């Protein structure tokens, strides 16, 4: 797939698969905006990868997401790489109600991403 010149927003893009995707997309010629709720991770990544636009935003903050998407302009691709795997690593019957709630909260975050990111 040719992504040269396309605008890509990556949610959860400061570590793991999200960061690897951001780096690969930028090397392939895409314009990349990479977001994380961690200010520390955003600062570190911006220093290491100045060719990528890193932003601090929480998926539960619709206004923050709106600002991110507006800065990216016309969006060609949205990548959702934000996880929360540490909340769901136990076998099903060993997880607490709170762990289930936290895992399901990711759904609401991604709902906000789609609502704000899709024209």
How would you describe each model-predicted region?
Residues 11, 75-84:
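Rossmann-fold scaffold of SDR-type NAD(P)-dependent oxidoreductases
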């Amino acid at each position: 797939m040719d992504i040269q010149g396309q605008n890509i927003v990556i949610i959860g893009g400061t570590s793991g698969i999200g960061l690897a995707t951001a780096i690969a997309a930028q090397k392939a010629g895409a314009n990349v905006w990479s977001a994380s709720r961690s200010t520390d991770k955003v600062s570190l990544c911006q220093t290491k990868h100045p060719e990528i636009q890193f932003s601090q935003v929480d998926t539960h903050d619709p206004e923050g997401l709106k600002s991110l998407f507006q800065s990216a302009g016309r969006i060609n691709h949205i990548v959702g790489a934000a996880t929360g795997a540490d909340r769901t690593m136990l076998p099903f019957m060993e997880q607490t109600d709170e762990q289930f709630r936290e895992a399901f909260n990711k759904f609401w975050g991604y709902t906000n991403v789609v609502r704000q990111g899709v024209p």
